[in-house]
């Protein structure tokens, strides 16, 4: 049973973690009609394009520092309740700016929620700044430059998400160079909607230590071997992959094939209520796919080893995992 296992998550978009009931309440608070995006207590979307539209709507009903603080605190307390000891939240200041909130105010609100959750539960959390791919290379470059000049102790990484089929990875490489030179950890969404070539482009042009999703690397055996050889960690989101029809079902999901080939992976929920999942559920899904508790513990260790966090905190997290009877096996 995975319920008792300690957990860690590296891939979750904060607005995408907002439950429909909270979003409906926020919409009512601001006099916004949510009926096009929430029906019968669930989010309404049909494909990736409509999912992005629904996500943007959800983001639009959080409008103040207090709103974002409450969102971050609620999600982290939920995670802590299922034995999660570490979380990285993907945060996009573009969403704050879209509702008239400065990037700095957006971050400070989220940080307030993170600190409150840590005080109440002990969960550690860091933020990874997102550049939105579908807003174009210049916008992502602007975000990286902002990040290089804005130092916050809870911001430790840079990422790019959004519509993977727009533009070339090469168009965004300068933004990642800026973030890397400023000392931030690098991850990037690839190998989800697009095939193995997008993972290869990410490795060649962005040089990340982690890749968000990356599961379509399975289409290229040489690329799978390269991932294994280089130790790049895939942030795998099983329920998300099925909901977005990246794979037809869990039987055809390549997580087992990837781990058998020596690729390092960890378990994540992505945008949980959009995909009728949670981190606890994705851990249970991994078990249903045939992974043992020992293997799943190793994935949690991998997540902590790959986390964008200072070494003192990393070692503390690893010690907590060890003390719980986990982490004795070699990381997957």
Swiss-Prot record:
GO molecular function, one term: adenine deaminase activity
GO BP term, pick one: nucleotide metabolic process
Gene3D superfamilies: Metal-dependent hydrolases
Active site: 192 (proton donor)
Catalytic activity: adenine + H2O + H(+) = hypoxanthine + NH4(+)
Pfam families reported for this sequence: A_deaminase (PF00962)
Binding site for Zn(2+): 11, 13, 189, 270
EC code(s) of this entry: 3.5.4.2
Binding site for substrate: 271
Cofactor note: Binds 1 zinc ion per subunit.
Cofactor(s) named in the record: Zn(2+)
Record keyword DNA damage present: no
Keywords: Hydrolase, Metal-binding, Nucleotide metabolism, Zinc
Keyword Zinc assigned: yes
Site (Important for catalytic activity): 213
Functional summary from the UniProt entry: Catalyzes the hydrolytic deamination of adenine to hypoxanthine. Plays an important role in the purine salvage pathway and in nitrogen catabolism.
Family, as annotated: Belongs to the metallo-dependent hydrolases superfamily. Adenosine and AMP deaminases family. Adenine deaminase type 2 subfamily.
Record-given protein name: Adenine deaminase
UniProt organism field: Allorhizobium ampelinum (strain ATCC BAA-846 / DSM 112012 / S4) (Agrobacterium vitis (strain S4))
Lineage: Bacteria, Pseudomonadati, Pseudomonadota, Alphaproteobacteria, Hyphomicrobiales
